[in-house]
UniProtKB/Swiss-Prot annotation:
This is Glycine cleavage system H protein, mitochondrial. Its cofactor is (R)-lipoate. GO terms for molecular function: lipoic acid binding. Residues 1-47 form a transit peptide. The lineage of its organism: Eukaryota, Fungi, Dikarya, Ascomycota, Saccharomycotina. HAMAP family: GcvH. It comes from Saccharomyces cerevisiae (strain ATCC 204508 / S288c) (Baker's yeast).
């Protein structure tokens, strides 16, 4: 029995690879505002190679945040800087930044749009980004730019595509 156990454990993937393959951590939290904003849930959820996510609803309202993978790499958030409501931000431009005990990281806009609301809860409690990055830790609510179709925006990935990039990064 002991020998069988040893053989079994040597075949197990590392913890990080096992987590990435099972990866419910990078999926949108279905019990929180970014999902519940509309009764049907988001029309599309997409990810960037810089570890941001965007959840787009039927009315072209979108929520933007960072992934669980990003928060794990960043460490405990101590400060979140976000743009003012009404700010127009083009895809790839800085949306703000998150400072942590380890470093500071820029957050980039996944698609053209105008900021409609910021998550003011993060001003007093930036750790929510770590606790629930795919739900209560959303950063901004925005209106997509005219003619933007998130499914056709270059560089955005499905959850499956995004997680494949994470496995290759390790």
């Amino acid at each position: 029995m002991l020998r069988t156990t040893r053989l079994w454990t040597t075949r197990m993937p590392t913890v990080s690879k096992l987590f990435l393959r099972n990866s419910s951590g990078n999926a949108l939290n279905k019990n929180k505002l970014p999902f519940l904003y509309s009764s049907q849930g988001p029309q599309a959820v997409r990810y960037t190679s810089q570890h941001e996510w965007i959840a787009v609803h039927q009315d072209k309202t979108a929520f933007v945040g960072i992934t669980k993978y990003a928060t794990d790499a960043l460490g405990d958030a101590t400060y979140v800087e976000l743009p003012e409501v009404g700010t127009e931000i083009a895809q790839g431009e800085s949306l703000g930044s998150i400072e942590s005990v380890k470093s500071a990281s820029e957050i980039y806009q996944p698609a053209d749009g105008t900021v409609e609301e910021i998550n003011t809860n993060l001003e007093e409690n930036p750790g929510v980004v770590n606790e629930d990055p795919m739900g209560d830790g959303w950063l901004v609510k925005m209106k997509l730019g005219e003619g933007v179709n998130v499914e056709q925006v270059e560089g955005l990935m499905s959850l499956e595509q995004y997680e494949k990039t994470l496995v290759h990064d390790d």
